[in-house]
């Protein structure tokens, strides 16, 4: 009985849905700390450290070969997904990217094309697809899972603005300016407010995870998590920047764990072994920041 309580406690600390949606939404309205935004260049350090950590990542569980669809972040293209693509292929997955060029905002032409690609991969492989999206790509991933849940095995967001509201003050000025330039003169709210409402009211009935960083300088941690409305959603913390999430060894470690679960046998994220102990200690430290 004692061991069961300890396991539950660990799961609650790192991989359980937020229970107070109102409080989470209120905190999601705050912008990221300026110091985190100014230090986003540390993503280059995460990229530089990745080759040194590859031997550890090669010890992560191999997958069963099911297809994985990757979606890039805002203003980014498939080229930014090379780290995730190479790693997931090394774990045995059939990896595809969205193939739609630069992500210039949440737009109908992209949502329709992404859903078509999701259905195509499902048909081609005769297996359900895991959809992983970085930043704005995570909103696309959840939206696609909402539109075609019968095709989706898991959906994972990486530092995605899942809970931005109509309060534009929470959006960093640079992001706001880029969105106005590439997508819409009104900024992110023009496209995303109605999408978020739909996602939060009726999340896809598939296993889902929001991976977030407490020191994200673009999307604040509370905005990158969502309130779980079913028993298979989890919010998972990782250390790092926003711009480095696609090359972050901790992200890859978590993804390998989540994607390797047998289909239909979902369990919450529970760090194991030496890396698990290090993760636990780092998570405790992060809560004091």
Segments and roles (model prediction):
Residues 66-79, 83, 89-205, 211, ...:
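Serine-dependent carboxylesterase/thioesterase catalytic core
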Residues 29-31, 61, 142, 205, ...:
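N-terminal hydrophobic alpha-helix used for membrane targeting or insertion
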Residues 62, 106, 132, 163, ...:
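Residue-level signal for alpha-helical context at structural boundaries
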Residues 1-68, 81, 86, 91, ...:
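Flexible, membrane-associating and regulatory peripheral segments of lipid-active enzymes
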Residues 204-289:
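C-terminal catalytic-base region of ester-bond hydrolases, centering on the histidine
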Residues 47-50, 120, 180, 184, ...:
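A structural signal for alpha-helix termini and helix-coil/disorder junctions
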């Amino acid at each position: 009985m004692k061991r069961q309580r300890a396991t539950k406690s660990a799961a609650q600390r790192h991989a359980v849905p937020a229970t107070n949606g109102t409080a989470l939404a209120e905190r999601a309205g705050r912008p990221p700390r300026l110091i985190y935004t100014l230090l986003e260049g540390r993503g280059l350090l995460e990229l530089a450290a990745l080759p040194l950590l590859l031997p550890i990542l090669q010890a992560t569980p191999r997958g069963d070969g099911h297809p994985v669809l990757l979606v890039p972040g805002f203003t980014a293209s498939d080229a930014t997904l090379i780290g995730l693509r190479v790693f997931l292929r090394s774990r045995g997955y059939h990896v595809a990217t969205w193939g739609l060029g630069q992500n210039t905002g949440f737009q109908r032409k992209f949502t329709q094309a992404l859903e078509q690609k999701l259905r195509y991969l499902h048909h081609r492989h005769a297996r359900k697809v895991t959809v992983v999206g970085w930043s704005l790509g995570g909103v696309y991933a959840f939206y696609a899972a909402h539109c075609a849940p019968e095709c989706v095995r898991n959906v994972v967001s990486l530092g995605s603005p899942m809970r931005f509201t109509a309060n534009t003050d929470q959006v960093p000025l640079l992001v706001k300016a880029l969105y106005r330039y590439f997508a819409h003169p009104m900024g992110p709210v023009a496209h995303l407010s109605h999408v978020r409402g739909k996602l939060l009211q009726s999340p896809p009935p598939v296993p889902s995870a929001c991976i977030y960083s407490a020191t994200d300088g673009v999307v604040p941690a509370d905005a990158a998590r969502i309130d779980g409305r079913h028993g298979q959603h989890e919010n998972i913390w990782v250390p790092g920047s926003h711009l480095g999430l696609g090359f972050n060894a901790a992200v890859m470690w978590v993804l390998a764990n989540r994607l390797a679960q047998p289909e239909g046998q979902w369990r919450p994220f529970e760090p194991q072994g030496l890396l698990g102990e290090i993760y636990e200690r780092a998570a405790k430290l992060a809560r004091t920041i």
